[in-house]
Amino acid sequence: GIIKKSEVEVLYPRINVVHRMWDNLLKLEAQISGYQRSYGFPYSDWYENPYYNALKYNPTYSVKNEDGTWNESGSSPTRLNPVALLEETKGDNKDTNIKMYGKATLNPIEGLNINWLFSREIDNFYGSYYETSRHKSTTMYGKNGYASQTSSRTQNDMMEITAQYANHFGSHNIDGLVGYSWNDYNYRYSSMSNYDFPSDDYTFNNMGVGTALTEGKATVGTSQNSSRLVGWFARLNYNYANKYFLSASIRYEGSSKFGANHKWGTFPAVSAGWNMAKENFMKDASFINNLKLRAGYGITGTIPASSYMSLTRLNLGGYAYYKGQWINQLKASGNANPDLRWEKKKEFNLGLDYGFFNDRIFGSIDYYIRTTKDLIWDYKVAVPPYVSSSITANAGSIRNSGVEVSLNAVPVQTKDFTWNSNLNFSTNKSKLLSLSNDKYVAGNYIDGLVFNSITHRLEVGKPLGDFYGWKSVGIDENGGWLIESADGTVKSFADAQASDRKVIGNALPK
């Protein structure tokens, strides 16, 4: 690396095996690949990054004092001597990843392919970090050496079975597919830290000797996350003479992340197309090689990031006096919701694909309307009857509509040289349709915070991405800010009220 102790060693093994049998009726494939990466980045947090501190630290300061100790005269909790950071830290990190992939393809009759696919990816990470007794953050907080270790294991399994058939009868062309998919995800994490070590020689290899452990100040943490997704799907495509096109598909999927009453969702789609360039009435326009009008409608589902939003979540919070001592309470941090279900996006699309002069000029024009319903949001609820003041539920809806245009050209194309030009244009209009329903109420707007200050507002009937704050209109004779109040008059910022805030712009491009 370009910074001391930032060297990285990486090993990339890969094995591929392909075998055919039964006169090529069956094809077997297997692949094993992965990597092992070892590195020792000498910092744990951004403010201990030596490169970050080298940019902020005064370059005229000497690295060390006359007595050989590190010069920390210009240091602060967020500005440290970068050379001292490098020399007084030690890191040892190993990340091992392996991917296993297997596939079997059977062709029992012409046009029919039966596929079985399985993959497993495993990632194991182990990281160790140590700050010596001379490290600024340990001397600043009296820790006399600090060590931490983290480890994690991620395993992602996937299986898919499909049967696909394709054939043609004269000018009629069909292909269809049916299948089943399964995905299982598991993640485990553990960490520990300790400080006040009798010697720096231990580094992170004898975590138990730090006296912070006996004082109850060491930290230990573990977490686990798992989810499963299962789906059945089918698709049918038909075209006549590559002129008229029809397509229909459906997916029936279930996810463990949703409530017990709504784990499954059905997602159909249908589309049609007409390539007018193939019609007889277009023969005189020989420069047009493609002019395809198409339309489609479909529903897709969105899965939340967290695996346990439909369940009661527990957390430590508050203390209770019990049998002569204060006990940290275990309490609900979120209510169970057996009716938590898929977010559903319904989209209609109307488009035109074009190509002129054998696709020397080509592109597309699309118009879409997209409505997302059953948005997942955290709502405030009464306690009792609920055990927690928050519940994750489906209530809101958003509509987006817009136009997308692409224009591509090949002005010059020779044996040895090709010139491609591309131009894209898009516009989108969004509108928040609702935030609440009969059961869960969030009001007509939600304010977004950055560092505890209101910066955005999400309001029913308005577009997404609105900046919300005070509108500055100048400064007074003393250099103070002037703002526009709610009634349109000008007032000093010192007299500003929360009600004077207004929409002052939008973060999203039109």
Where are these regions (language model features)?
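Solvent-exposed loop/turn segments connecting transmembrane beta-strands
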Residues: 3-5, 256-261
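Surface-exposed loop/interface segments of Gram-negative outer-membrane beta-barrel transport/assembly proteins
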Residues: 3, 12, 16-97, 115-230, ...
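Transmembrane beta-barrel architecture of outer membranes
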Residues: 8-14, 231, 265-267
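Transmembrane beta-strand segments that form the barrel wall of outer-membrane beta-barrel proteins
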Residues: 1, 246-255, 411
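Glycine-centered tight-turn and secondary-structure capping sites
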Residues: 349-351
